[in-house]
Amino acid sequence: MTSPFKVVAVSGGTYRPSRTLVLTQALIAELGQSLPIDSRVIELTDIAAPLGATLARNQAPAELQAVLDEIESADLLLVASPVYRGSYPGLLKHLFDLIDLNALIDTPVLLAATGGTERHALVLDHQLRPLFSFFQAITLPIGVYASEADFDNYRIVSEPLKARIRLAAERAAPLFGGRSELLKIA
C-alpha cells in the first residue's frame, strides 16, 4: 500500500460558519474517494491574529511557523477563498507572502472560491491562479467556484456544484497515481 498523500487545505475565510470551509471539506472528502490522503485544514480565522502581526517570516511565532511549514511540505495544496470586492482577502495574500519563494515549485494546487453571486467566478483565473503561477506551482486546470445559491444553511445543495467537486477531484487523482474515471464533458 502506498503511503497517503499530504493534502494541506487553506480555507481563507475569517467567519464561522463558513461556506468556504464547507466547500473545502467537500473537496477533501471527494479527494479521499480517489486517493489515499492525510489531510490538514488550516482555517485563516484560527491564525488571523498572529498572521496579521507578523511582518516577516523570521518574526513568525512558532504556531504560525508550523502552519507555513505545513503549506510548504504539502503534496497537494487546496486553497479556497471567499471573494470580497472581486478578490481574495488581503490576509490570505499575506499568508502566502510569508511562504518561501521556492517552496511550492511543482506543487499541485487545487483552487476553490465562494462568493455571493456568479459574477465573482473569474476570481479563480484572474486572481488566484496568477498568485500560484508566481510560485511556479502547478494549478490544476479545473477550479471550483460556489455562490450563495449553491448552499442552504451551510450545506451544499446544488447538484451542479457537487458534480464540479467530483470532477475536480477526479482530474487531480491521476497526478498521484489515483484512480480516475475521467468524466467527459459534453
Swiss-Prot record:
The keyword ATP-binding does not apply. It comes from Pseudomonas aeruginosa (strain ATCC 15692 / DSM 22644 / CIP 104116 / JCM 14847 / LMG 12228 / 1C / PRS 101 / PAO1). Its EC number is 1.5.1.38. The keyword Flavoprotein applies. GO terms for molecular function: FMN reductase (NADPH) activity; oxidoreductase activity, acting on NAD(P)H, quinone or similar compound as acceptor. Keywords: Flavoprotein, FMN, NADP, Oxidoreductase. It catalyses: FMNH2 + NADP(+) = FMN + NADPH + 2 H(+). This is FMN reductase (NADPH). Disulfide bonds: none annotated. Belongs to the SsuE family. SUPFAM superfamilies: Flavoproteins.
